[in-house]
A protein has these predicted regions:
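Short linear motifs at protein or domain termini
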Residues: 1-95, 148, 220-225
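A generic short alpha-helical patch detector that favors 3-5-residue windows
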Residues: 4, 76, 80, 100, ...
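Solvent-exposed, amphipathic alpha-helical segments
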Residues: 11, 15, 83, 87, ...
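Short, flexible helix-adjacent loops and helix caps
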Residues: 17-21, 89, 93-97, 117-121, ...
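Short, flexible turn/loop "capping" segments at secondary-structure junctions
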Residues: 58-59, 133, 183-185
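A ubiquitous short alpha-helical element
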Residues: 71-75, 93-99, 120-125, 171-180
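Conserved amphipathic alpha-helical segments that form helical-bundle/coiled-coil interaction surfaces
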Residues: 99-168, 187-190, 202-213
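C-terminal all-alpha effector/ligand-binding and dimerization domain
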Residues: 165-225
Length: 225
């Protein structure tokens, strides 16, 4: 998926998350493309992607509509992902981090450090973060010697906003979003540290907490302002 395609997916996801498109609303390629100022092709791809994420469902032969879901549904789905990813992290820590997995995780940790080190975000950073975040989570999930957890996460990812890469980053307030990604990067580094040290319980706890950033961050930021 190109950066332009990812941007369209992210913008649509944000509009749904903010309630600009309400459950039951029908979405057409032409209307959405005109609203976003893009061609129909990335919109068509975005519809398919968001259908897989559980945000849209088919309505008729060619149309899509926003799926019905509640905040309780979102919270439960994200919490389930945290439990499953925490289980994977604990298993990986207790098994011992293989050198090749250590190297892969270190690479993406350094990518995140470099992105955060400059002290601000630009719009192109959003796709970079999405890529490194997906790799970090994916490596942990697929390195435990069993596909059971990965399969369970894949099924859960079909629920609205459940997937690790469905986090909403507001490109209209990058200063605020920088703080969220700064915290997420700190979590990544702590998780990596616990994996290297073989601290299974700590890795599990950190991974479960990390999954909740998207839900709890607005509340935490409001308390600090």
């Amino acid at each position: 998926m190109s950066n332009n395609d990812k941007n369209v997916v992210g913008r649509l996801r944000k509009l749904i998350g903010e309630g600009r498109y309400s459950p039951g609303d029908r979405l057409g390629e032409v209307a959405v493309a005109e609203q976003l100022g893009v061609s129909r092709t990335p919109v068509r791809l975005a519809f398919r992607t968001l259908e897989q994420e559980g945000l849209l469902q088919q309505a008729g032969k060619r149309g899509f509509m926003v799926r019905e879901f509640t905040q309780a549904d979102v919270h439960c789905a994200v919490e389930v992902r945290g439990v499953l990813e925490g289980l994977a992290a604990r298993h990986l820590a207790e098994q011992g981090l293989p050198p090749d997995v250590d190297k892969e995780l270190s690479f993406w940790i350094q990518k995140g450090k470099k992105l955060i080190a400059k002290g601000y975000l630009v719009e192109s950073d959003i796709n970079q973060w999405s890529e490194l975040n997906a790799h970090f989570h994916g490596i942990i999930i697929h390195s435990i010697g069993s596909g059971v957890v990965a399969d369970a996460i894949a099924r859960n990812n079909h629920l609205p906003f459940a997937a690790a890469d469905s986090i909403i980053i507001d490109s209209d307030d990058l200063e605020r979003e920088f703080k969220k990604l700064q915290l997420a990067q700190f979590h990544h580094e702590l998780i990596f540290q616990s994996l290297k040290r073989g601290e299974g319980a700590r890795a599990e706890m950190l991974m479960r907490e990390h999954a909740l950033i998207g839900l709890r961050y607005p509340e935490l930021l409001a308390d600090s302002e």
